[in-house]
């Protein structure tokens, strides 16, 4: 999964 910062740039799924 992607880290929280990567999620902000559209990376999915996000780590929780």
Curated annotation (Swiss-Prot):
Disulfide bridge map: 1-15, 2-11, 7-14
Keyword Disulfide bond: yes
Domain of life from the UniProt record: Eukaryota
Keywords per UniProt: Disulfide bond, Secreted, Toxin
Main localization (coarse): secreted
Tissue: Expressed by the venom duct.
GO cellular component assignments: extracellular region
Gene Ontology molecular-function annotations: toxin activity
Transmembrane parts of this sequence: none
Subcellular compartments: Secreted
Family according to the record: Belongs to the conotoxin M superfamily.
Domain notes: The cysteine framework is III (CC-C-C-CC).
The protein's name in its UniProt record: Conotoxin ar3d
Organism, as annotated: Conus araneosus (Cobweb cone)
């Amino acid at each position: 999964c992607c880290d929280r910062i990567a999620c902000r740039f559209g990376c999915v799924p996000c780590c929780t």
